[in-house]
Amino acid sequence: MKYKDLRDFIAQLEQNGQLKRITREIDPYLEMTEISDRTLRAGGPALLFENPKGYSMPVLTNLFGTPDRVAMGMGQPNVGALRQVGTWLSYLKEPEPPRGLKELMEKLPIFKQVLNMPTKRLSSAPCQQLVLEGEAVDLDQIPIQHCWPGDVAPLVTWGLTITRGPYKKRQNLGIYRQQKIGKNKLIMRWLDHRGGAIDFREWQEAHPGERFPVVVALGADPATILGAVTPVPDSLSEYAFAGLLRGSRTEVVKALSCDLEVPASAEIVLEGYLEPGELAPEGPYGDHTGYYNEVDEFPVFTITHMTMRRDAIYHSTYTGRPPDEPAVLGVALNEVFVPLLQKQFPEIVDFYLPPEGCSYRMAVVTIKKRYPGHAKRVMLGVWSFLRQFMYTKFVIVCDDDINARDWKDVIWAITTRMDPARDTTLIEHTPIDYLDFASPVSGLGSKMGLDATNKWPGETNREWGQPIVQDEAVKQKVDSIWAELNILG
């Protein structure tokens, strides 16, 4: 289903019983986090806080608090259908002409969707109904959440950050958290490998000393938001992918202060710049790991223009020990990753990122094993194929008779098919998550691969065990009399 903007999505969620309006006064300082956290852990609805303490602007949280709501936002009927999104991405990553009429007909839906990828630029847009600039810019008008007791300041969490480097035509969209440090200043916390950081670095090389234009959109339509967190190919704009998801072209409008394009239906837009050399200490903040992160310096975003829709809604979230909203997104996006990986490694049967592993720090892969050493090839491939997995610390590879999503199955495979010395691969001095304080050096650590597959000749000299399997005829006979036996009542 198509959603023209965030408000349309909210209306559909409410109609489906997936949104709860809270009219009681709730404080953005800690209280919204506690209510949102309890709701998410119970699989509850999105929340619209209509009366934030001290503010007139409502706050939307838990928008993507269940995998099914993520699928809805991507225009799909359920989580399983997200595999189709992964199929689109795998084709866009490595497009191939159809080989014959049959393949042409199979790929026709993709070709039709591609027509929705170019953006549609408007001359005016709802996101610019109200305009504040210069001294009138005031972030204090926005009920920015202060999520955890140890957080240093309020934190913008769903800021859709729009940048363009000097060497690329396409714009980059990314979600980076932003600490509020003044009425017109935020800290732009992005890691070196993220698209926005790369654009800024290249800008400073090409235009030394010049200000770098940046726009942050809050409350865009769901397809645009989710497009920014999906592993789209580097050559493809997230706006284009959002059009593919939505089934209609993404409507944008030129920013007032620069040539960047912003989502036309966004609730709030912050325009401004990064001044080269202007840094500020960011953090500590409670993060998706379940811990407070270290303090480090990041660029300062100075806001020159703040535009809004009338009666704007502030879209927010919190991060903490899983499950949180990023973990839920990880569960849903897991389905998108499977076809991408299978295109490169057809032997992969399933791929699972357990949410308890902070969404990406551990992966379980099942394969149709073909030769000795196959599991090691796959684990090395996972670490290197997609940028999203460069921070995955543990990769467990099992045979296709194991359910990657069932820990009982996976643990059985590890304990019966692995020799710790032979089947463990350790790699040192690799890129690691900056937030991973367990690594010996910030941003640099090790990885472990576990080969929990059945071993082939060449991998072992011993006769390998045969799994116990009941006779199929006996199973069918017992099935036929099971209800009559009434053993379990």
Swiss-Prot record:
InterPro entries in UniProt: UbiD, UbiD-like_C, UbiD-like_N, UbiD_bacteria, UbiD_Rift_dom
Molecular function in Gene Ontology: 3-octaprenyl-4-hydroxybenzoate carboxy-lyase activity; metal ion binding
* Record-level GO BP terms: ubiquinone biosynthetic process
Reactions that this protein is recorded to catalyse: a 4-hydroxy-3-(all-trans-polyprenyl)benzoate + H(+) = a 2-(all-trans-polyprenyl)phenol + CO2
Stated membrane topology is: Peripheral membrane protein
Q: Where in the cell is it found?
A: Cell membrane
Where is it mainly found? Answer: membrane
Q: Give EC number(s), comma-separated.
A: 4.1.1.98
Biological or metabolic pathway of the protein: Cofactor biosynthesis; ubiquinone biosynthesis
Cofactors named for this entry = prenylated FMN; Mn(2+)
Query: Which Pfam families does the entry mention?
Result: UbiD, UbiD_C, UbiD_N
Question: Got a GO cellular component term for this one?
Answer: plasma membrane
Q: Record-annotated residues binding prenylated FMN?
A: I175, Y176, R177, R189, W190, L191, R194, G195
- Coiled-coil zones: none
Q: Which UniProt keywords apply?
A: Cell membrane, Decarboxylase, Flavoprotein, FMN, Lyase, Manganese, Membrane, Metal-binding, Ubiquinone biosynthesis
Top class in the EC scheme: lyase
Q: List the disulfide bonds.
A: none
Where are the catalytic residues? D287
**Annotated positions binding Mn(2+):** N172, E238
| Note accompanying the cofactor annotation | Binds 1 prenylated FMN per subunit.
Per UniProt, subunit arrangement is: Homohexamer.
Q: Which family does it belong to?
A: Belongs to the UbiD family.
Role of this protein: Catalyzes the decarboxylation of 3-octaprenyl-4-hydroxy benzoate to 2-octaprenylphenol, an intermediate step in ubiquinone biosynthesis.
HAMAP family assigned to the protein according to its UniProt record, in alphabetical order? UbiD
What is this protein's record name? 3-octaprenyl-4-hydroxybenzoate carboxy-lyase
- What organism does the record attribute this protein to? Aeromonas salmonicida (strain A449)
Which taxonomic lineage does the organism of this UniProt entry have? Bacteria, Pseudomonadati, Pseudomonadota, Gammaproteobacteria, Aeromonadales
